[in-house]
Amino acid sequence: MPRLSRRQLLKTAAISTALSTVPAPLLAASREKLVVPPLIEVRRGRPIVLTMQETNYPLDGSHNVTVWGFNGNYLGPTIKIKSGSFAKLNYHNNLPQSVALSIQGLQASGELFGGAARVLKKGESWAPIVPIEQPAASCWYRSATLANSAYQTYRGLAGMWLIEDEQSLKANLPNKYGVDDIPLILQDMEFNNDGLQLFKQNQPHFVGNRLLVNGIEAPYLDVARGWIRLRLLNASLARAYDLRLDNDQEMLLIAQDLGFLPKAKSVKSLVLSPGERAEILVNMMKLTTYLSLAEVNVACTKNKKYVVLRR
């Protein structure tokens, strides 16, 4: 496949497709539907309210347990903001621990977007105003608390932060959030018999044995006919993922951590290290049943399929 310039990418793309034979109704019956994080689209100075708090959620699929997150949900909402505007943040910490937050990939000074030096104790709030002055990119926010960031991120203090610019807004790319423009937050975890998250504080490279997408293990998602855009985030602590489509179909890699690639790349697999982001396009036009985003080499995991895309 010829390499595409960014200008060509914003106009058109082409990927070969393949078919799978498992009936979609049977497949979906054994899986939960993907939860798409709520969207906060910032317009005309709308404040971004992020309240860190405990909530109840069945992470293991059966036990309703206490987890952490934002605004009453496990994980945080997706923030979408245009370059050239200001992010009016309102952080509130209702958790039993002190928390510092950071926005990874955001090009702004640390005193404005947080970091380990800006700690919020239980009950405290903070309302910085952050100028957004960079090209379109998929960033993410997470805990940056000194000596405790891994644990707090693992508990659920993470979410996606999407920056758009004039070019990305005019692009001929999927942009209907939750329909054909879908965030996928990848995590690995361990649970006890009661469904509570296990975290091995003294293990330098913690790797769980359960794989979750947006807080659900191996979910399915009904998607639109045609092209879909997947915004991938590896929110795991130590696990790197080698991702592919299980029918060996090609994906079009269009963006990574700091924005669009100079030229799009047709790939059959994609490696994501912890904290890395990537955007891929998948052609669902000819697909009659489903395909799965899976990991090529998964060790010590219960289920290698991350999310089933069903049309």
From Swiss-Prot:
Classification via InterPro entries: Cu-oxidase-like_N, Cu-oxidase_2nd, Cu-oxidase_fam, Cupredoxin, TAT_signal
Chief localization: periplasm
SUPFAM superfamilies: Cupredoxins
GO molecular-function terms, A-Z: copper ion binding
The keyword Cell division appears for this protein: yes
Domain of life: Bacteria
Keywords in alphabetical order: Cell cycle, Cell division, Periplasm, Signal
Extent of the signal sequence: 1-29
Compartment annotation: Periplasm
GO biological process, one term: cell division
Domain Plastocyanin-like: 228-297
Post-translational modification: Predicted to be exported by the Tat system. The position of the signal peptide cleavage has not been experimentally proven.
A single Gene Ontology CC term: periplasmic space
Family stated for the protein in its record: Belongs to the FtsP family.
Role this protein plays: Cell division protein that is required for growth during stress conditions. May be involved in protecting or stabilizing the divisomal assembly under conditions of stress.
The protein, known as: Putative cell division protein FtsP
Species, as recorded: Haemophilus influenzae (strain ATCC 51907 / DSM 11121 / KW20 / Rd)
Gene: ftsP
